[in-house]
């Protein structure tokens, strides 16, 4: 009987957890190493919008459609009712010719979408003050609490023989004649056949021991997460101002400065307060 390939995944966020599950489904022996606690850090500050609204090529559009279907299947497989919501999206981020171009592109792609007028938007979102004159409803879209989803995936992986070690800092990789065979950590060394660095902006720091660099353009944005609130919002709202939604647990997630143009001199708390005021 042949030995299962040993795969180490560094990072337990939504990317690392998903890779762990996919590799386990292919009969690999899985070890996930996390420097903090299960679910990672970055996934807890993810907007988590599941969509195929914007794609620069037909191949990318097809990939994103597959991702939506994959998330639906994952939700059924792992019963992600506490972290995954298929609420659809109301979009009016652009206006005029840009709005028309987006609608035309969705139609040409055959995307599940409908053009709404102001009254129709108000019916769908009765608590929305100042409804737009028109918006696009993309009703096949959803959103996930990425951190909680990652934890659910890892729980499934662990229940099927995978292992997760928390508070484990990877300090470098081990290789012999150019071939990787393990990782160095603060709690000891671990052998593996393959290694996945699912550590986002920290990926380069885990490559000590390899004569190879990973070009990255890390920029700063802002995602807001509120405490739980009574239900008042039915869809993800991609407005001309703030992007926001209400999660399964009642909390709000709001996105600001997605493009990475965050002013390093800005006061994050003041900016967060201003953003919440704009939502109100």
Task: Give the residues covered by each predicted segment.
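Active-site lid/adjacent beta-loop-alpha segment flanking the redox-cofactor pocket in flavoenzymes
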Residues: 231-280
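Beta1/beta-strand and adjacent pyrophosphate-binding region of the FAD-binding site
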Residues: 2-15, 31
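Conserved Rossmann-like nucleotide-cofactor binding loop
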Residues: 15, 38, 202
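Central helical "cap/lid" subdomain
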Residues: 188-234, 268
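Helical element adjacent to the flavin cofactor pocket in flavoenzyme catalytic cores
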Residues: 136-193
